[in-house]
Amino acid sequence: MKLEHVDKGKAVISCENKKEFSQYLGYMHGGMVSAIADTAGGHAAATMLKEGYKTVTSELKIHFLKPVVSKKVIATGEVLSAGKRLIIVETTVRDEEDNMLAKMIATMFVIEPSK
């Protein structure tokens, strides 16, 4: 995975599709698609944090819209809502031709720095 771009409330991750990521039909495994989407959403959420704070995924829901057969996927994570304890993100996973492959919404839990 490669972090392509980060702005306040937004992050873009790309990932080359490799044989090791395939499920038995030859498509990218849903777990890998989820990991890419979660990573983009996590980076987007991290842009909203105060110094010393961290975030982890509390829950996520993903819709797989098309099988991933492209050589590369691009995941764009965007913050929908940022509160003191929870950050809600939405990530869209697309192929190189801009076809939507998956859509994820996730809740990120904010962890305060140790005292």
Model-derived segments and their meaning:
Residues M1-M28:
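Catalytic strand-loop segment that frames the active site of acyl-thioester-processing enzymes
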Residues G31-E51:
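Active-site helix/loop of acyl-thioester processing domains in fatty-acid/polyketide metabolism
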Residues A44-I74, V79:
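Hydrophobic beta-strand-centered segment that forms part of the acyl-chain substrate-binding groove
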Residues C15-N17, F64, V110:
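Hydrophobic residues in beta-strands and at strand termini
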Residues M1-K2, L60-I62, T91:
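Hydrophobic/aromatic beta-strand elements that line small-molecule binding cavities or substrate pockets
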Residues V68-S70, I74-T76, L80-K115:
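HotDog/MaoC-like acyl-thioester-processing domains
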Residues Q23-A35, T55, E59, V68:
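Residues at secondary-structure transition points
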